[in-house]
Amino acid sequence: MKLLPIWIGITAYLSCFGIITSAQTETVTISIQHELKETETPKPISWVVVPDGSGRSLLVLQGGQVLVVPADRKQSKISSFLKLSPDQMIVKDFEEGLLGLVFHPKYRSNGLFYLYHTLQSPKRSVLVERRVKDQKKLALDPNHNRTLIEIEQPYWNHNSGVPEFGPDGYLYLSTGDGGKANDPHDFSQNTFSLLGKVLRIDVDQTEGALQYAIPEDNPFKGKPGYRGEIWTTGMRNPWRLHWDLPSKTLYCADVGQHQKEEINLIKRGGNYGWSFREGTGEFSLKNRKPSSEFEFIDPVFEYGHDEGTSVSGGIVYRGTKHPELY
């Protein structure tokens, strides 16, 4: 029996999707059915299980609303968990908005969770800590709203980012390259910038003026010319991360430009090539060559736009309900 990662492209939502794996090239077709037929769910971003044993989930919408989906949808109605103002987050209705939500590993004892979203005036992305004061009712503490990170965003696209906790208890955050096309400011390879990276921080501690601490084993902590938060460089628009906790493997779906969509295995200190490369091939529109000290990590899987569109994310499936996924 093989355990296979499942990755889904945007076109998957039309009627059915192919399961593309790094372990093999075969495609398994399964059907998709509507789960929330009577609920307005514009631009769903993610589905997050509430880690309290209740069976409830949160449906995160890019426009700023988070819905509570009960375990028994026949007996209980969907309700609102929180709602952010779209006017404060979004100027151009494309990639801006509420992009990620993750619960703290010790949520049952501290009630904490984290949002990643854009803000305007000035244009920026923020990682914010919030708290649930009544876990049974999923009621928010209105007085707990702590901003940990603010990242200036030059444009309205490539704002991608999703926070995920690793098995080490640290928070990993993917960030886009700042937008437009061709990475015009070379942020992805700029080690002073937090754009075009995967970051790793300790949200349970503070350090100096920071609202978080930088783990001692981060690859660039204390290295001149580098931000210590950086875990990897060379990302374009890493829309989703997924931790396969049993194998302690971090997967990343990095959206391409014109040539390739990438699935990457995230490694400590790795450089994934953008904008010198797109996928395993040279990115010729920049008309430049990397110097000899650059070492790039190839994606474990890539596909061209003749096969599909934007890679949107995925999971490693370890269940037994759908044996065709093995």
Indicate residue ranges for each PLM-predicted region:
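Bacterial N-terminal signal peptides
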Residues: 5-18
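Generic hydrophobic-segment detector
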Residues: 5-8, 151, 224, 303-304
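Beta-propeller domain segments
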Residues: 52, 60-63, 96-98, 106, ...
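N-terminal secretory signal peptides that target proteins for export/translocation
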Residues: 1-2
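Acidic, Gly/Ser/Thr-rich repeat motifs that build Ca2+-stabilized beta-propeller blades
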Residues: 23-182, 240-256, 307-326
